[in-house]
Amino acid sequence: SYGGVFSRLEKLGINIKGIPVEDDGMNINLLSECLEDLKAINIVPRYIYTIPTIQNPTGTIMSKEKRIKLIELAKKYDAPIFEDDCYADLIWGEERPPSIRALDDSKRVIYCGSFSKSIAPGFRLGYLVADWPILSRVLPYKTDAGTGGLEQMVLSEFCENHFFDHL
């Protein structure tokens, strides 16, 4: 996973528990065991972080079945899912699986995407999609990597008129 995420979470005092990745994504059985262990000591995870599509560094893609099971576990243990899907636009030659957020009807997925991988690395722009109760709590932690206003306006214009053609 992206190292910047871990350093940021550690600065916020969040404990991180890693779950191994299999050929078709996160090991859901081990995740279930971990969540059950946490529940036994009255700990509710702040969220479950995953890169389901082109996971870094393995390049694995979580199967649709595992995405659905992940949502079921998140519901069972009342844990939001942070879906880091910044590499999803890099899929070539095969069908892109639906995002976890698209499969979720409980509104517990925070979806993170990036224009840096799909349009231009120099832009260093990303975005979050979440319902307002979640997004309002996340906004105070946003950072700016120095992307200028002009670049943001150019990207906005591009997305408004041409983004779907680009994909």
Kindly label every feature range from the protein language model.
Residues M26-W92:
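Active-site phosphate-binding strand-loop segment of PLP-dependent enzymes
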Residues L12, K76-Y77, K107:
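Helix C-cap/helix->beta junction micro-motif
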Residues G18, I81-E83, L155:
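Hydrophobic residues in well-ordered beta-strands that form the structural core
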Residues P98-S99:
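Catalytic cores of nucleotide-enabled group-transfer and carboxylate-activating enzymes in metabolic
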Residues N15-D23:
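Short beta-strand->loop structural element characteristic of the AMP-binding/adenylate-forming
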Residues I110-L167:
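PLP-dependent aminotransferase class I/II
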